């Protein structure tokens, strides 16, 4: 039995094209997407001359249309291919059982404010005490043997609008214990001098790790997002080039520290600014615990980060988590503080994209992780990171239709994807004129996981009507539909 349709309507603010343009034929790109001669649906008929002339003589209506963005309606109905549900149900149940073994969020964590006005009286007192110790140390040259200004991440320890935020990181890392925080600060400054961090930042290091670690976009709260892709080390040539001997492991550590230092210097250390990073760790095809060189290098890097880079991680998301990682977490979990645990999020392969979307908007998530954002080196002339996307959950055995009502002549460009696909997708234009034919933009197509992750279409609209994007999910698993569109003037 078909379910009752459920509809949500929202108005999407878009850049509006001018309505005063003359009608034109459908573009060549659109013609390619239209039905062939063997299909029964045909191109929409042209508007007759009297109606066109009548439209151009009503400037009042044109003015109204100029300020009327497209209206979007999302409608859910029963799947027309529901018979496939039973065929896949048993396999999905097994997958769900495995997925349930992976822990999700291990506790709630709310990032502390970096505004001085939000500090408690005891926290303000601790900050003042730490600043006093720093002042004494500077006067007595405890940090350096020369009277030069001491900076960390390019910021002076005192007498700068950003200094308090830096000192607060050390205080929070040591639970506002002033002496412990000061000791940590001294050790960090000493290590930075020995490691020659300021010189390292300016070096031109050569590495092949641009696909292993990279920054891409921001989360919903404005934190820059760093992706760590461990599966790249399945490449034996890259692995040996990075970890085969002690010298190469040292070089790997230097490149990682340089990357982190450069990323930190782009953060906002002003009061109330964003001074932490969202870390995404992709565990897909990770070499695992058997690679002792990787394990040793990772352990060394983690220790350095904990000792010298306090409170720079907002959240640690582990995605595509394999079963063996549960063993690893069981070992290290008891040694982690509740505060550290509360920053961790885990997701298996089937829930990785959905988990990322909780924290990062789809337009900011790279295509390879279920989002719409292409590599910064690639060119996407139609969309940017600033073009927001909408998300819909397509329930098992249902069909979701996105209805975009057009009020003026324009070219509509859209991107659409369903994580993992395994659905049917079609697109069509339905004119407002009753006697006009529906135009098939994309005939029904069964999408497989091996198909292109993101579909991009465009359609020139020469009369009032609506574009319908329909996704039919016949499986027993809910899907995440993501789409966005832009309106271009003709």
Swiss-Prot record:
<keyword id="KW-0446">Lipid-binding</keyword>
<feature type="compositionally biased region" description="Basic and acidic residues">
    <location>
        <begin position="79"/>
        <end position="100"/>
    </location>
</feature>
<dbReference type="InterPro" id="IPR011074">
    <property type="entry name" value="CRAL/TRIO_N_dom"/>
</dbReference>
<comment type="function">
    <text>Carrier protein that may be involved in membrane-trafficking events associated with cell plate formation during cytokinesis. Binds to some hydrophobic molecules such as phosphoinositides and promotes their transfer between the different cellular sites.</text>
</comment>
<keyword id="KW-0963">Cytoplasm</keyword>
<dbReference type="Pfam" id="PF03765">
    <property type="entry name" value="CRAL_TRIO_N"/>
</dbReference>
<dbReference type="GO" id="GO:0008289">
    <property type="term" value="F:lipid binding"/>
</dbReference>
<protein>
    <recommendedName>
        <fullName>Patellin-3</fullName>
    </recommendedName>
</protein>
<dbReference type="InterPro" id="IPR001251">
    <property type="entry name" value="CRAL-TRIO_dom"/>
</dbReference>
<dbReference type="Pfam" id="PF00650">
    <property type="entry name" value="CRAL_TRIO"/>
</dbReference>
<feature type="modified residue" description="Phosphoserine">
    <location>
        <position position="108"/>
    </location>
</feature>
<feature type="compositionally biased region" description="Basic and acidic residues">
    <location>
        <begin position="57"/>
        <end position="69"/>
    </location>
</feature>
<dbReference type="GO" id="GO:0051301">
    <property type="term" value="P:cell division"/>
</dbReference>
<keyword id="KW-0832">Ubl conjugation</keyword>
<feature type="region of interest" description="Disordered">
    <location>
        <begin position="1"/>
        <end position="121"/>
    </location>
</feature>
<feature type="compositionally biased region" description="Low complexity">
    <location>
        <begin position="46"/>
        <end position="56"/>
    </location>
</feature>
<dbReference type="InterPro" id="IPR009038">
    <property type="entry name" value="GOLD_dom"/>
</dbReference>
<feature type="domain" description="CRAL-TRIO">
    <location>
        <begin position="202"/>
        <end position="377"/>
    </location>
</feature>
<dbReference type="InterPro" id="IPR044834">
    <property type="entry name" value="PATL"/>
</dbReference>
<keyword id="KW-0597">Phosphoprotein</keyword>
<keyword id="KW-0131">Cell cycle</keyword>
<dbReference type="GO" id="GO:0005737">
    <property type="term" value="C:cytoplasm"/>
</dbReference>
<dbReference type="InterPro" id="IPR036598">
    <property type="entry name" value="GOLD_dom_sf"/>
</dbReference>
<feature type="cross-link" description="Glycyl lysine isopeptide (Lys-Gly) (interchain with G-Cter in ubiquitin)">
    <location>
        <position position="193"/>
    </location>
</feature>
<keyword id="KW-0472">Membrane</keyword>
<dbReference type="InterPro" id="IPR056794">
    <property type="entry name" value="PATL1-6_C_GOLD"/>
</dbReference>
<dbReference type="InterPro" id="IPR036273">
    <property type="entry name" value="CRAL/TRIO_N_dom_sf"/>
</dbReference>
<feature type="modified residue" description="N-acetylalanine">
    <location>
        <position position="2"/>
    </location>
</feature>
<feature type="domain" description="GOLD">
    <location>
        <begin position="353"/>
        <end position="487"/>
    </location>
</feature>
<keyword id="KW-0007">Acetylation</keyword>
<comment type="similarity">
    <text>Belongs to the patellin family.</text>
</comment>
<feature type="compositionally biased region" description="Basic and acidic residues">
    <location>
        <begin position="109"/>
        <end position="121"/>
    </location>
</feature>
<keyword id="KW-0132">Cell division</keyword>
<dbReference type="Pfam" id="PF25099">
    <property type="entry name" value="GOLD_PATL1_C"/>
</dbReference>
<dbReference type="GO" id="GO:0005886">
    <property type="term" value="C:plasma membrane"/>
</dbReference>
<feature type="compositionally biased region" description="Low complexity">
    <location>
        <begin position="1"/>
        <end position="17"/>
    </location>
</feature>
<dbReference type="InterPro" id="IPR036865">
    <property type="entry name" value="CRAL-TRIO_dom_sf"/>
</dbReference>
<keyword id="KW-0813">Transport</keyword>
<keyword id="KW-1017">Isopeptide bond</keyword>
<feature type="compositionally biased region" description="Polar residues">
    <location>
        <begin position="19"/>
        <end position="33"/>
    </location>
</feature>
């Amino acid at each position: 039995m078909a379910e009752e349709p459920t509809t949500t309507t929202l108005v999407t603010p878009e850049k509006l094209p001018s309505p005063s343009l003359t009608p034109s034929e459908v573009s060549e790109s659109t013609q390619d997407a239209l039905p062939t001669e063997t299909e029964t649906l045909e191109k929409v008929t042209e508007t007759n001359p009297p109606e066109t002339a009548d439209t151009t003589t009503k400037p009042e209506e044109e003015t109204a249309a100029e300020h009327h963005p497209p209206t979007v309606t999302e409608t859910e109905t029963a799947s027309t291919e529901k018979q496939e549900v039973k065929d896949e149900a048993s396999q999905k149940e097994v997958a769900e059982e495995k997925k349930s073994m992976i822990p999700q969020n291990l506790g709630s964590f709310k990032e502390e404010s970096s505004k001085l006005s939000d500090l408690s009286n005891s926290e303000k007192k601790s900050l003042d005490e730490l600043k006093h110790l720093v002042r004494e140390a500077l006067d007595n040259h405890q940090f350096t043997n020369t009277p030069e200004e001491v900076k960390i991440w390019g910021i002076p320890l005192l007498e700068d609008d950003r200094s308090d935020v830096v000192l607060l990181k050390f205080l929070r890392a040591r639970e506002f214990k002033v002496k412990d925080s000061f000791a940590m600060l001294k050790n960090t400054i000493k290590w930075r001098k020995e490691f020659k961090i300021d010189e390292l930042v300016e070096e031109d290091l050569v590495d092949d790790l641009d696909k292993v670690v990279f920054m891409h976009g921001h989360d919903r709260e404005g934190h820059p997002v760093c992706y760590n892709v461990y599966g790249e080390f399945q490449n034996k040539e890259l692995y040996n080039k990075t970890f085969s001997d002690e010298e190469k492991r040292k070089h790997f550590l230097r490149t990682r520290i340089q990357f982190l230092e450069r990323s930190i210097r782009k953060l906002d250390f002003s009061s109330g600014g964003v001074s932490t990073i969202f870390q995404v760790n992709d565990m897909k095809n990770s070499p695992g615990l058997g690679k002792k060189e990787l394990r040793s290098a990772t352990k060394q890097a983690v220790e350095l980060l904990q000792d010298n880079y306090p409170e720079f991680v907002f959240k640690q998301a582990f995605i595509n988590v394999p079963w063996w990682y549960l063993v690893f977490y069981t070992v290290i979990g008891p040694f982690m503080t509740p505060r550290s645990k509360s920053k961790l999020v885990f997701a298996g392969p089937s829930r990785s994209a959905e988990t990322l979307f909780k924290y990062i908007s789809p337009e900011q998530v790279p295509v390879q992780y279920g989002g719409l954002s292409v590599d910064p080196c690639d060119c996407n002339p139609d969309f940017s990171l600033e073009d927001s996307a909408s998300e819909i959950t397509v329930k098992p055995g249902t069909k979701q239709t996105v209805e975009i009502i057009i009020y003026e002549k324009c070219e509509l460009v859209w991107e659409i994807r369903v994580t993992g696909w395994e659905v049917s997708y079609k697109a069509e234009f339905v004119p407002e004129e009753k006697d006009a034919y529906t135009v098939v933009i994309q005939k029904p197509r069964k999408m497989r996981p091996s198909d292109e992750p993101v579909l991009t279409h465009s359609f020139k609209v020469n009369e009032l009507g609506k574009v319908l994007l329909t996704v039919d999910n016949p499986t027993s698993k809910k899907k995440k539909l993501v789409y966005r569109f832009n309106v271009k003037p003709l």
